[in-house]
């Protein structure tokens, strides 16, 4: 009887888990479905609601959407690539020093870095804005890139330092005996072994920068260097009155770079390419 009761409870528990997963999947898929449907409908079909399938899908809306935001997407990609590279490079170098060297005040400095993680980012916006003005980089791409690199250091240092500390110390001892410098060990040992965590941090930084709306709105007014998230709202307001399907298509097109970058990053994990770092 006990085994039978446990079996029933197990089946019941699995059923609840499956139902919850289905609900979560639907909650994730529904906004995407609504956006796709509206992006393919004519104005008359748009008024009828979301559930009716489009009789004549308006695929040319996607061409119009891309033409509207392509320059802004390029601006976003440039900012995201430079910021991501800066965050990964400088934070990994700092983490290497914290994980491989002992020096006076090391623990205090690392505790200070960790304390900065507790500070809400909104509290640093005003000081960052004043620094941008003092540096004379307001309304330039550097107003996006430099604060992005500085703001992304704290979490990245913590992540990299935790990972670097777990790397075999024997590799570094052998390299030191062979006369390898810190720079050599950093590029030839530490980074190749840390490719998975480097990719994780790069994807996170890229996504945060690409989706950022508030900070670019504060520091960039020049139309030629605005990011895609800045432009979406203004362009959507202009076209929504005439062809609302184009505005929905823009939302979908703007997400394509994030999807492609994520797929490229996941490729390393699926193919096991990160294991190549073990071949020293």
Task: Describe these PLM feature segments.
Residues 4-9, 13-280:
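A structural signal for multi-pass alpha-helical bundles of membrane permease subunits
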């Amino acid at each position: 009887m006990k085994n039978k009761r446990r079996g029933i409870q197990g089946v019941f528990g699995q059923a609840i888990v499956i139902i919850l997963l289905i609900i979560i999947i639907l909650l994730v898929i529904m906004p995407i479905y609504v956006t796709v449907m509206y992006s393919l409908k004519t104005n008359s079909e748009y008024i009828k609601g979301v559930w009716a399938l489009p009789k004549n899908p308006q695929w040319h809306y996607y061409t119009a959407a891309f033409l509207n935001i392509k320059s802004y997407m390029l601006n976003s990609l440039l900012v995201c690539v430079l910021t991501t590279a800066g965050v990964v490079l400088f934070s990994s170098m700092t983490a290497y020093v914290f994980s491989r060297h002992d020096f006076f005040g090391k623990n205090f400095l690392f505790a200070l870095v960790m304390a900065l993680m507790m500070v809400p980012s909104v509290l640093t916006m005003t000081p960052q804005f004043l620094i941008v003005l003092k540096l004379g980089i307001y309304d330039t791409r550097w107003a996006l890139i430099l604060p992005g690199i500085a703001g992304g250091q704290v979490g990245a240092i913590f992540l990299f330092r935790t990972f670097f500390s777990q790397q075999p110390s024997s590799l570094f001892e052998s390299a030191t005996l062979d006369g390898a410098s810190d720079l050599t060990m950093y590029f030839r040992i530490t980074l190749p072994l840390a490719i998975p965590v480097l990719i994780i941090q790069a994807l996170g930084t890229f996504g945060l920068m690409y989706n950022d709306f508030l900070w670019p709105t504060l520091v960039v007014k020049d139309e030629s260097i605005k990011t895609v998230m800045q432009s979406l709202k203004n362009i959507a307001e202009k076209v929504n009155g005439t062809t609302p399907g184009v505005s929905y298509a823009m939302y979908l097109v703007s997400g394509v770079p994030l999807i492609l970058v994520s797929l490229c990053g996941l490729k390393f994990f699926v193919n096991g390419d990160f294991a190549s770092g073990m071949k020293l």
